[in-house]
């Protein structure tokens, strides 16, 4: 009986232990090389809502409003930003690298019927690898965020890539963003027009390093409201 109790206690403990950090993955990965985006191009704007309360959780989950990617992805994103300038747009970044603990907080706080919009912490997120980016466009002439037909983190069909209910201008901007990102190796997530994954995401491990351990913050322009 004593052995049975021990076995049951261990069985109950395993799931809890499994959620105490990123899942352990087999294989070999490239060494992480997270770069703060605004150090490569300070004209990339930041609107890091997870450092504020105006997000779907209603509370900050980052202590600092910063955005990072693995170096090859960051360099590719700078090329996207500069190419879009020829079309009259720049990039506003909502989120890049995301510590695993934040992914778990998102999952725990999201209703079952909305979990298509958040990553399962048991598998980890491509954001945790520093290879995903959430972003939108802004108008160079006015500095205002572009109207994309659905807001960031809007958990509705309007956020789907296949949504066709917007205006021609909204859909054209989505297509412009997708095309520019695709040419530099970023592929859109079908359920979120703002979310793109870098082609080499499988090469990097899942990370749970908070921003404050990634060096001194760099200054960045603040995004204007649409």
Task: Name these PLM-found stretches.
Residues 18-96, 106-191, 200-226:
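Extracytoplasmic cell-surface/polysaccharide-interacting catalytic and binding patches
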Residues 196:
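Conserved metal-phosphate-binding beta-hairpin within the catalytic cores
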Residues 5-15:
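Bacterial N-terminal signal peptides
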Residues 99:
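Segments that shape or occlude catalytic/ligand-binding pockets
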Residues 102:
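Short, well-ordered surface patches within globular domains
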